[in-house]
Amino acid sequence: MKRRLYLSSSSPRRKELLDQAGIPFDLVNAPVEETGLPNESPESFVLRMAVEKALSGFNKVPGKNVWVLGSDTIILKDGKVFGKPKHKMDAYRMLMSFSGEEHTVMTSIAIVNDGAVYSDVCQTNVFFRPISDSEFEQYWATGEAEDKAGAYGIQGQAAKFIEKIEGSYSAVMGLPLYELDKLLRESNFYSE
């Protein structure tokens, strides 16, 4: 019986990465409320979000031999969590706090299959070179900053701000492909 992978996400970057990896998938729309719990650690939060997205998607997909993938990304710097910017000044605050500094991108993935949950969190350290106010203005004008955790996309024009990374490029983009492949193997997605 044919196995199906469903992506419980509206992220164009996650779709692009699955296509790049050659993994056939369908989309399922299953949004969840992304609110932290009292005293929840950033790692626990990002992992819980991926699991909730996968479970929500799994509950909307009928049939057997179904694997549903959920994922979430946050950025952590100096104990603060950075999600998507709410407006231009929020994006400015985020990018200027990364300017000339290191921050950590945490991307979680969860796969739900017949009640079993497989999950992982990938952490990548990203080092930015200093960014000027005029560079921020130019970057903001591209529109890239608006829908991304930390107000930047590594695969876009913000790549010129990144001095180096320690970890997974695809995780910074939104979906750690090595960890995804590992979980798909653990969950017997590839088995005949």
Curated annotation (Swiss-Prot):
It catalyses: dTTP + H2O = dTMP + diphosphate + H(+); UTP + H2O = UMP + diphosphate + H(+). It comes from the Bacteria. The record marks R13, T73, Q155 as: Important for substrate specificity. Its cofactor is a divalent metal cation. The active site is at D72 (proton acceptor). Its EC number is 3.6.1.9. Pfam families: Maf. One of its GO terms (biological process) is nucleotide metabolic process. GO terms for cellular component: cytoplasm. The keyword Transferase does not apply. One of its GO terms (molecular function) is UTP diphosphatase activity. CDD domains: Maf (cd00555). HAMAP family: Maf. Nucleoside triphosphate pyrophosphatase that hydrolyzes dTTP and UTP. May have a dual role in cell division arrest and in preventing the incorporation of modified nucleotides into cellular nucleic acids. Belongs to the Maf family. YhdE subfamily. This is dTTP/UTP pyrophosphatase. The lineage of its organism: Bacteria, Pseudomonadati, Pseudomonadota, Gammaproteobacteria, Thiotrichales.
